[in-house]
Each structure stands twice: as C-alpha cells, then as structure tokens.
Regions:
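DUTPase catalytic domain/fold
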Residues: 1-130
Length: 130
C-alpha cells in the first residue's frame, strides 16, 4: 500500500510519513505558489520556514490504497509541539493509487523559523477499512 515501506516507520496504529524533496512556497504579492526543490538540504543543513509562512509539501511515500481502505493524515504530535500546523485536508479515499500526499503546512511560531529537510518525519497515516 505504501512505497517505499520502511519497517521502523510502522507504529501500533499508524505509519510515519516523511517529507519529499519538493515544496511550494507562497510568492510575495500574488496568489501563486512557487515550486522549490529541497533535495540539497538535510537535517544538518535544513531549509528554514519563516514564522507564519505557509507552504505545500508532498510525502516521499507513494500510496496505493485498495478499494476497501481509506487513510487519514495527521501531524505527528512532536511536530505540533515544535510549532507546525496542518490544514486538516488529509483524507485519502479508497482506491487512491500511485500518488503522493500533498500536505498544507504552516509554521505557527511567532518568532522562530522551523527547519525542514527531505526524509523528515512529519506526520502519520491512519488506515481504515471501509
């Protein structure tokens, strides 16, 4: 159902998902978002998201849901405590196949930038039989 599957990302009731290597950042003075590659960044040298900044990100994982399984994305609680916020548009219908999840994320801190990098564990997918 998920590729790549990483055994250590499996939790008792969910699967951790990670950031891919592209984000979309809001451009100043326009409604458009600009695709930005973050593949050159790492945990040691991250890309910094400014306070209040909104962006779209995709998961590294690709999902292949059968017709009888739905999924719900939720932010990891540790990331919420860091100051991340998610727009709660994370429902995946049964039969959703061959796609990465797009996440609507925001740095909700007032003063400090938050780091991101490809492979960063950002959230969890809960799978439901329907």
């Amino acid at each position: 159902m998920v590729t790549p599957y990483v055994e250590e990302h499996l939790n008792p009731a969910s699967l951790d998902v990670t950031l891919g290597d592209r984000i979309m950042i809001e451009l100043t003075g326009t409604r458009e978002l600009e695709i930005t590659g973050i593949h050159n960044y790492s945990e040691e040298q991250p890309y910094w998201i400014k306070p209040g900044e909104f962006f779209l990100a995709e998961t590294r994982e690709i999902f292949h849901l059968p017709d009888y399984v739905g999924a719900q994305f939720v932010l990891k609680s540790s990331r919420a405590r860091d100051g991340w916020d998610h727009a709660e548009a994370g429902w995946c219908d049964p039969g959703w196949y061959g796609s990465r999840l797009t996440m609507e994320l925001k740095n909700s801190r007032r003063l400090n930038a938050l780091p991101i990098w490809p492979g960063m564990r950002i959230g969890q997918m809960k799978f439901l039989l329907v």
